[in-house]
Amino acid sequence: MRYSASLVIVALFGFFLYHNLQPKPVNTSKEGLVLESILSTVQAVHLDPKPIDDTFSETLFDDFIKKLDPSKIFLTKKEFEDLQKSKFLIDDQVNARTFEFFEKSILLSEKSISRAKKIFEEEINKPFDFSKNETIETDREKRQYAKDESELRKLWMQELKFDILQTWTSKKSAKEKNEKKEEIKTDEELKTQAVTDVKKRFENYFKRLGELRRSDRMEFYLSSVSNYFDPHTDYFSPKEKQDFDINMGGQLEGIGARLQAEGEYTKVSSVVVGGPAWKTKKLEDNDIILKVTQKGGETVDIAGMRLDDVVQLVRGKKGTVVILTVKKKDNSVVDIEIERDKVQLEDGKAKSVMLNIPGTLKNIGYINLPKFYSSFELEGGNSCAFDVLTEINKLKEEDVNGIILDLRNNSGGSLNDVVDMTGFFIEEGPIVQVKGREDNPYLHLDKDKSVEYDGPLVIMVNQFSASASEIIAAALQDYNRAIIVGTPTFGKGTVQRFFDLDRAVRGYDDMKPLGNVKMTVQKFYRVDGGSTQLKGVIPDITLPDLYTYIDVGEKEYKNAMTWTEIKPVKYSQNVAQITQKKALAEKSKERISKHPQFLLIEESAVKIKEEKDKTTVPLNSVSYTSMKEQKESDNKKFDIVMKDDIANLVISNLNTDLEKINMDEKNKALNEEFLKDLRKDIYLEEVLYIMKDMIGLEKSFTTQQKKIAEAK
């Protein structure tokens, strides 16, 4: 099960050949070099490069303005119209590698933020009149820019009133539910507290805006340039690429502590179990970091420093030492010396449990995979394929009779790993076709004849299962190896690859690193020739969902690539053929039609669509409270959905996992939270009954499998 290297060689050859022939950059500033590198890389390797013309200019203008003023609460109509004069000139500037529109827009943006902050500081301390019959439009697309500063001030008053109303009514609801547990406060006191909370939130908001650097805004701009070509082509600064690699690989070199901003300081939000900081037994959750010292180097007072700058000070190579000066809960100040090391992040990693319904079903393994992670940069890095195989083997050791692979909310990741993982369930054969600019598609094959698991298999998906999740679901559906259950998936049928922009420009070493561009270089196709682009994977068995009547997924993007198809390839497998999909779907449909919670989910989906279409909200306290109470009354019957544990469902940790779970109270708590959600999951309950039906109906499964799958 190995990734075909030929495609990588072709793509990289084209990339380097193109750049070796490039003339000297027109604009040799760092920003100019980055822009030059992005655009030349697009032309060299993007699946479908577009010309830099008026369409580009118009699209970039709309996207960048939306990033600068997402709620239309900063710019006035006159300022917007002033910027709009550049709407069809940006392409000329980009082709010349100049930044006139960018310069003008950030100048106006900074000015408008400063003005908005002043308005906020003046208005938040004035009394708010909630007796007026006025409304606020919450949909940005329906909003108009304020005509002048007077109208802008009115808009800010509405924004503040809306936030205060939301906070105030939430506090009143909490008071009604918890009167015996909390100090009883008057309605006026709750309103005052709501104003204080909103004031603090906006102060923090303006503080974050004030910390934005030119480089941050340039990253937004370069992202808009990249996004024009398709939604998944994007620019990554060196720091963003580092964070992406950590997220994908689940591993970093540092101290193993999660940090968050706390006023002027940085707080330890959690210490990673098993990491260097945890091993010292000195650094604790909620410690406030005051200073950071590299051993043998200078001490840096981090008061007022941006969180990402603090993170860069704390991270470092394995074996190096950092000293944190922290303030404890008792206000004592201590120095904590920590030797950096590799840190394994357990968040998002594959994990499994055993499911039983006594008298109905026995020993069904459940594997949860939140993302297709892989560590390319670090030696000994994580691989989700390896981890899933580990979970399969652990389940087999405990006599598993069926496996459920849960890919709900899994947005994808490593193509290599999904090819390997799909191969665990078939003998050998094609997994996915990928096609770039070349005429001929490339096949990613499972070349390993061994089968890691040959029993009953169900894959759970939803509308947020994307990319790699869709590859494995589509392949095993086409092979009739598994039943796919859930909702139509996201519909991302494209492949991206990172390109280091330092390699796109010769010389200029003093300005590097320039960052990376994540580029769409291929589409992937099912073995039957179809594509998941826009359409997603349609489940064999569809279950009700809250988002049924709302557009979710790739089709939401205006610049999404189109659906296409190519010729199918020959494929077959003899491990286990699922032949009773129609019968299984009918049995599930019958159960769903009688299941009170699924019926409520269908009803709730209609309500969600109706509420989404209502974008005008009253700012009169009586009207707002009445509206909220009506919503709560309408939605009260939906509260029972996935609130209680499923009757008779027994979920057990695997014996091999117990030692790790019990090594720390945090691990115990995280495990209990994981199990708690599963115990209430009616989708999982229905999948268990689908598994039972499948084992009973399918001839592929042996008499012995049918026998041991039934509880005695």
What are these regions (language model features)?
Residues 123, 142, 146, 162, ...:
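Conserved functional hotspot residues or short segments at active or partner-binding sites
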Residues 4, 22, 26-27, 44-52, ...:
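Cleft-lining beta-strand/loop regions that shape enzyme active-site pockets
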Residues 32-39, 53-65, 80, 87, ...:
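Extracytoplasmic/secreted envelope proteins and their assembly/folding machinery
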Residues 468, 480, 485-552:
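Polar, glycine-rich mid-to-C-terminal structural blocks
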Residues 52-58, 65-139, 206-261, 321-323, ...:
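Extended, small/polar residue-biased N-terminal targeting/export presequences
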Residues 5-18:
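Hydrophobic membrane-insertion alpha-helices, especially the h-region
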Residues 35-47, 85-89, 200-204, 370-373, ...:
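Acidic/histidine-rich, surface-exposed loop or edge segments in extracytoplasmic proteins
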Residues 66-67, 88, 105-118, 126-169, ...:
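PDZ/PDZ-like domain segments forming the peptide/carboxylate-binding groove
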